[in-house]
């Protein structure tokens, strides 16, 4: 990855993709941003609009492109796919989005792309697993937004409950980005002090913590029911991961990472803290879990693996499962 000229390709310029592109421009990340979208006119419009914004942020080439732009990209961010609708779970999107990911991944890899892939399309854990298998890229270079957004939501909820800044809370949501996720309360801290100790001192019950966990789990549905989609939160998570990659930060972030032995789980993608730098994921941070959390991690992994296996088989990707 060149330090002097970094190129990002965005695939999918919908609500999330366009919000991500705007965040990228606002942060002055990368010198080149290519936007690939089914509707070329929309991508051209966004590119022209974002180009104006660069005058006030940092010089950047922003333009509409096709998949050939991926050939020399440092990072390709995939936001394309069918969006979650009111009443749908993320896992309801498996079939149609696996088919879309199959075509997108093959098109990207046909260009000779050898950078890092970052995914946000749901169900993101299942799709990232499939994309890694199809691409043949090292698992360390195929990452998803994972539970980064869920962890942010947890920190916000806890901050409101405790009357502190979310910046001073260290707490992770883990496993699936979806209905089987859980809050790893046993390792959470507030200003360095164990969260559970603070809750005991303040009379905050376990039931209250489980209610917060459930609210975090369902926050996306609340947003979708009101405005039809989520975009700003996940786009900002993608920007944060992008910054860690392009600036080689060695930042510990909750992402969707390949798990192969950690937590007693093999060959899966799950939300967990990991060290992110210019090589992608340099290390998975295996968080100590209590019995409840460990069981939740295992159950989530088993459910996701079955969905991935069944889904990939149905769309003709069974041969990739043995790789």
From Swiss-Prot:
Its EC number is 1.1.1.27. Gene3D superfamilies: Lactate dehydrogenase/glycoside hydrolase, family 4, C-terminal, NAD(P)-binding Rossmann-like Domain. Substrate binds at residues 84, 90, 122-125, 150-153, 230. The gene is ldh. Homotetramer. This is L-lactate dehydrogenase. NAD(+) binds at residues 16, 37, 81-82, 120-122, 145. The active site is at residue 177. GO terms for molecular function: L-lactate dehydrogenase activity. Transmembrane segments: none annotated. It is found in: Cytoplasm. Pathway: Fermentation; pyruvate fermentation to lactate; (S)-lactate from pyruvate: step 1/1.
């Amino acid at each position: 990855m060149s330090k002097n000229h970094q190129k990002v390709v965005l695939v999918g310029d919908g609500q999330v993709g366009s919000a991500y592109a705007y965040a990228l421009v606002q942060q002055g990340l990368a010198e080149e941003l290519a936007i690939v979208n089914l509707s070329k006119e929309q991508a051209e419009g966004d590119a022209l609009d974002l180009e104006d914004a660069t005058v006030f942020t940092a010089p950047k080439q922003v333009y509409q492109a096709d998949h050939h732009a991926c050939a020399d990209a440092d990072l390709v961010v995939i936001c394309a796919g069918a969006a979650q609708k009111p009443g749908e779970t993320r896992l309801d999107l498996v079939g149609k989005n696996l088919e879309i990911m199959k075509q997108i991944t093959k098109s990207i890899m046909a260009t000779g792309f050898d950078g890092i892939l970052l995914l946000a399309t749901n169900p993101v854990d299942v799709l990232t697993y499939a994309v890694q298998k199809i691409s043949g890229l090292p698992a360390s270079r195929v990452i998803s937004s994972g539970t980064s957004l869920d962890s942010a939501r947890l920190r916000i909820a806890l901050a409101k409950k405790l009357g502190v800044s979310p910046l001073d809370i260290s707490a992770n949501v883990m496993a699936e980005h979806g209905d089987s996720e859980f809050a790893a309360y046993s390792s959470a801290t507030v200003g360095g002090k164990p969260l559970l100790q603070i809750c005991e001192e303040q009379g905050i019950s376990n039931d209250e913590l489980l209610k917060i966990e459930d609210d975090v789990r369902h926050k996306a549905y609340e947003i979708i029911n009101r405005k039809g989609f989520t975009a700003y939160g996940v786009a900002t998570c993608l920007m944060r991961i992008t910054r860690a990659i392009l600036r080689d930060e060695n930042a510990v972030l909750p992402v969707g990472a390949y798990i192969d032995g950690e937590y007693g789980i093999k060959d899966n993608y799950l939300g967990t803290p990991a060290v992110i730098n210019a090589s992608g994921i340099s290390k998975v941070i295996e968080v100590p879990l209590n019995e409840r959390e460990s069981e939740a991690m295992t159950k989530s992994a088993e459910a996701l693996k079955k969905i991935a296996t069944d889904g990939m088989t149905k769309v003709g990707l069974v041969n990739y499962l043995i790789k």
